[in-house]
Amino acid sequence: MLSLQFITHQTENYSYLESARMALEGGCKWIQLRMKEASPEEVEAVALQLKPLCKAKEAILILDDHVELAKKLEVDGVHLGKKDMPIGEARQMLGEAFIIGGTANTFEDVKLHHAAGADYLGIGPFRFTTTKKNLSPVLGLEGYTSILAQMNEAGIRIPVVAIGGIVAEDIPAIMETGVNGIALSGAILQAPDPVEETKRILNI
């Protein structure tokens, strides 16, 4: 089964919580609660409702950026973007038990995050995406192939999740580059039935 990380997104039809609930219902086992414009209090309110839902489905829950909150709420970990707290600092604060993921766009990013102790890397974007502002250069299939080859050559063994503007039809070709999983948001939420779409994607 595909290793799928669902990244929450608020749309006209769905709240952050509802988007995560549908992904869980469809069988997704890894949720990243991402609420970029929200205050820590707003994130905490949603996380407190989402945590038991994830637990009931035996799914991993990580927060985007909010390291202190992740520690306070005892979720499974955090995902840190390029402008968030440095991974090394987060590791000191959280200890070894928490999952820490980092965003990477180049092999240089990969080396830095690996050295800092990241548990996995979200590498992207695959293509242009409307869910993220200040987008890094688009990688495409060639970008993943190149970065993974350099990782292999350098002996860097760390799980890679492809992220950024990915739709279901892209998944087979992206997985062939050697990545370990896929992160999705819009591809699921824009489907007529997000629960069924999650199930379908997990079986690609």
UniProtKB/Swiss-Prot annotation:
The answer on whether this UniProt entry bears the keyword Magnesium reads yes
Q: Which SUPFAM superfamilies match?
A: Thiamin phosphate synthase
Q: Where does 4-amino-2-methyl-5-(diphosphooxymethyl)pyrimidine bind?
A: Q32, L33, R34, M35, K36, D64, T103, K132
What metabolic or biological pathway is this protein involved in? Cofactor biosynthesis; thiamine diphosphate biosynthesis; thiamine phosphate from 4-amino-2-methyl-5-diphosphomethylpyrimidine and 4-methyl-5-(2-phosphoethyl)-thiazole: step 1/1
Q: What keywords would UniProt list here?
A: Magnesium, Metal-binding, Thiamine biosynthesis, Transferase
Q: Which Pfam families match?
A: TMP-TENI
Q: Where does 2-[(2R,5Z)-2-carboxy-4-methylthiazol-5(2H)-ylidene]ethyl phosphate bind?
A: T129, T130, T131, G165
Q: Which Gene3D superfamilies match?
A: Aldolase class I (3.20.20.70)
What's the name of the protein?
Thiamine-phosphate synthase
Gene coding for it: thiE
